Amino acid sequence: TQSVRALLFDLQGNLLDKAQVAIDTYQSPQPGWLENDPEAFWRSLCDACQQLWAHTRVPRDSVRGVVITTQRGTTVALDADGQPLRPAMIWLDQRRATAIPPLRWWWDAALRAIGMRDTVRFFQREAEANWIAQHQPELWARTAHYLLLSGYLNYRFTGRFVDSVASQVGYVPFDYRRGRWAAGWDWKWQALPIRRSMLPELVPAGTVIGEVDARVAQDTGIPQGLPVIAGAADKIELEKALR
């Protein structure tokens, strides 16, 4: 959250070199709000990579792949051309929706019966998508792609709307037990204004999702053609590292 880091590891997982760029572009238009221009995340990523290449002794042609890991729960809304419609809402943002979509009566009754109705309402109030739909309905109507930050950076690297199942931490219609988007009948699709077409394809961590193109290679200094591999959200990666 505080910075972007570019890290070089060997095939045994040993850290060989790193560079770090502080993120100083966060904005708080109102108390409790926290946003950042998605393009600012990208520029910081590019700067960190270029700083790494400027001082490392590791040859670029020895690098074999790229993995992106990001802060969890930060959301990005894009239009049909893949352009950001508004600043990214950061996971620390405290705004809450007050007008939430109604659930069908049978879901409402079932959730009430098992004592989960208030929990689902909390989920709805916390969901960034519900806040945007309530307060910026014209913008939400133009939203063609709704991504977590990891999905946005994967898109910038590869031109594909693909993300890792291990990065889906946030108020999105994800089935955590099965590791996929929720089934069409699931209450989450009624609790949120998100359509399935807005969401990225999900793949397991470790899957090759694309490759570095010429434009990205120029911006980041990462060699063109390297595979981009699905990673995991920051907390998940930290937990794995501490095992």
Model region roles, listed by residue range:
Residues 27-29, 98-102, 175:
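Short, charged, surface-exposed secondary-structure boundary motifs
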Residues 1-87, 142, 217-227:
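N-terminal glycine/serine-rich phosphate-binding loop of ATP-dependent small-molecule kinases
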Residues 12, 112-233:
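Gly/Ser/Thr-rich active-site cleft segment
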Residues 237-238:
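Thiamine diphosphate
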Residues 80-85, 102-110:
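Hydrophobic or amphipathic alpha-helical targeting/insertion segments
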Residues 93:
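Carbohydrate-associated surface elements
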Residues 241-243:
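Alpha-helix C-terminal capping segments
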